[in-house]
């Protein structure tokens, strides 16, 4: 079922992309969409304040308790996204996924196959 969702998404991107079919256009739009997604996260911190970044060096000890030690690693994010920031970030990440699928289409790659190779 998941492969159908991925394939349908990738096919709909291919069908709806009227401009920017050139690989250089796709790469620049993909990079721009990533920057916009990153900027939206930064705005959630600096403009809205619904989340806070509190990051520091995290020491990971590779010993027999390695898996337990992974639970001590934090994301460095405090708080929860407000509804507005969540909506903006979701929209920007969706746009980023659109151009990722477009890049896969241009290169003849299947997004679901890539997901499986990375996941498994």
Where are these regions (language model features)?
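Flexible "arm" and connector segments at domain edges
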Residues: 1-93, 97-120
């Amino acid at each position: 079922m998941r492969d159908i969702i991925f394939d349908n998404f990738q096919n709909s991107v291919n069908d709806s992309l009227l401009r920017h079919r050139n690989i250089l256009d796709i790469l620049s739009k993909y990079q721009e969409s990533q920057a916009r997604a990153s900027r939206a996260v930064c705005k959630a911190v600096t403009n809205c304040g619904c989340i806070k970044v509190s990051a520091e060096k995290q020491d990971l000890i590779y010993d027999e308790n390695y898996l337990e030690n992974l639970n001590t690693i934090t994301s460095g994010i405090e708080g929860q996204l407000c509804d507005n920031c969540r909506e903006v970030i979701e929209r920007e990440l969706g746009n980023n996924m659109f151009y990722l699928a477009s890049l896969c289409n241009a290169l003849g790659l299947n997004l679901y196959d890539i997901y499986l190779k990375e996941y498994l």
